[in-house]
Amino acid sequence: MLVDTDPAADAAALERITLWALGQYSPIVAVDAPDGVVMDTEGADHLQGGELPMLTGIANRFRAKKLSARVAIADTWGAAHACARAIRRETVIVPIGETVRAVEGLPLSLLRLPPKIVGDLHTLGFKTIGELSAKPRAPLALRFGPELGRRLDQMFGRMAEPIDPVRTPDLIEVSRAFAEPIGAAETIDKYVGRLVKELVTEL
């Protein structure tokens, strides 16, 4: 059976999946539009038995709902995004430090660049991420602007790409910003105590 695409319904379903993942796997989860979810599982995957059991468990839970999923872990958001969409296996773990080898043969479209830039790069003869990353940066930046270099740097871990996590509507949280980093244990204890009191009053 074929049904018409419904972008609004798809976006709503993706939002629900993101909130589900927030409660199951990691406190740092966001929509990776248009068809994915990104999570920072560092420090959390051991709660699922490790990286492979966690990935396998996620894939199995989707399969139980008659949904197909591709799940990847990599050093960077960009690399995980690309591998999950290009590699046909259900689960992919890119070993630490192996990002270049994992993505260099993948198509340019997985760099999350605007379609116009991808089309122009194809016209110039570029097909893969590796071909593009091997070229001098300056001429490409002059022609295509900074976005191309930014996406390459994010994929290879040369530029940070923070995840702006989703928050549940009923989430209660408190925070304190500091002008300078603090490291003294007694100072941390003092402010944690204050934050706990603030949190209790919000409950």
Residue spans of the language-model regions?
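Gly/Gly-Pro- and Ser/Thr-rich, intrinsically disordered tail segments characteristic of DNA damage-repair
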Residues: 1-203
